[in-house]
Structures are given as structure tokens and as C-alpha cells.
Amino acid sequence: MDSRTTTAAEVAEQYGLAPLPVEGGMFRRTWAGPPDAGGRPAGSAIMVLLTDADGDFSALHRLPVDEVWHFYRGDPLELLLLHPDGSDRLLRLGTPLGHPQYVVEAGTWMGARVAAGGRWALFGTTMAPGFLPADYEGADPDDLCARHPRHAARIRALCRPGAPRSMPDTDGEGTRA
């Protein structure tokens, strides 16, 4: 499956992807481990599709659990990471010459979009323990721009003005990794 010959719509149909609320992109939860006494799955995994369309990106957010990002197909992703210690990193996930997999540590602000010149990217994320909608914390762009001024333009581009900063729990299973 090549991004030059396969369309994002074909990818979404092939894998049964649906819109990912708040964060953005199309996704499907592919696995959730057995729940603990509090209802949290032992682990969880999702597939996500992002495209080069305006407004299609993984909005800046953070999670209380490490999240492993896996590149599957298509064009590379540009992943912005703003760490709790004040450091930051702009990472390329996927080919050519990018990371095929990357662990984003708990508490790190993260957001992603298809790298310039790309059409779409199919990737996955895995968490253990698994995702619950209450884990998702959307970014306050003004706060992050003040703390990371050199990335202000990227931060604003990876935030949706007026969007909720929490993830709805609409299906009882959670809506992410």
C-alpha cells in the first residue's frame, strides 16, 4: 500500500476507520486487554490515519501513561514533543530516514501531522495500562507557546481553537489506544 497509488479513503475503508473525536484523524481500536477492578484495560492499541487535508492532525495532548507510536504505511509524520522538563523535540516517524517506532513518555505533550509533501500516514499507538477517555488532556496553546516559544507556530497549528480539552466516553470502551 503506497501513498502515491492508494488514497486515504481506500485506507480508511480497508481498515474500517472512523473519526477520532477531539484529537483528530480516523481510527479504530484494535485491541484492549482484560480490565482491572477499576475498569482500566491492561493495555490497548489503535490504528490511526492522518492526511494532508487542512485541519487533519493529531491535536496536542498529553497522557498519564507512556504511549508507543508505530509507523505502518504511507508518508512520514512530524511529531512535536514538549517534555515535562521543558525540553522539546521535533521527530520524524516513518520512512525515509525516520523512526519506525517511538515511545512518548507519560506527561509529554504530543501532536502530529503528515510531514510536508506527504499525502497520508497510517500508524498505531499502544499503551499499557490501556487508555481511558479521562486520560486525554488537550493542550492550552497560550500556555504551551509561553513555555516553548520557538515552537509557537507549530503549537498553534496543532491545536483546534474552541475544541474540548477532554475526550468523550461515548461507547463505554474508550475511544483511543
PLM features: residue spans?
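Extracellular beta-helix/beta-solenoid repeat scaffolds
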Residues: 107-108
